[in-house]
């Protein structure tokens, strides 16, 4: 490991919340998670250099597979473009996304990464 990597903070949505009943979809929760998570650690979207999303079943339950692109839609600051990728590893998707971000930070490619793990499993 060439440099130390730190997790600055985190945010977790309410598991009991019924998204459909509250007229929310995957993107609404994603956007809220980005902004609330950054606020929790006193960062702004402009501080993020790379983004990783862990997700297992968005294609099946939400008809959406390309979740890295959600960053661009979640804040105008991201319109300038940041590298963003989605990682799928069943129940370990969020962990794999974290490991991918960690590897980029260890290499010195980036100084600050955002990692989001998100699921909406409607029929399980």
Which residues fall in each region the model found?
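Noncatalytic linker/hinge segments flanking ATPase motor cores
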Residues: 16, 45-54, 89-100
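Generic detector of short, locally flexible boundary/turn motifs and exposed helical patches
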Residues: 14-18, 49-51, 77-81
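Short hydrophobic/aromatic-rich motifs at helix boundaries and adjacent loops
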Residues: 5-8, 41-45, 70-74
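General beta-strand structural signal in soluble alpha/beta enzymes
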Residues: 7, 53, 86-87, 115
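Conserved catalytic cysteine-centered active-site region
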Residues: 58-112, 120-124
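Signal peptide-proximal N-terminal region
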Residues: 35-47, 78-81
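Metallocofactor- and cofactor-centric catalytic cores in central/energy metabolism, strongly enriched
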Residues: 2, 20-31, 44-52, 58-61, ...
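Conserved beta-strand-centric core segments of catalytic alpha/beta enzyme folds
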Residues: 1-36, 40, 93-124
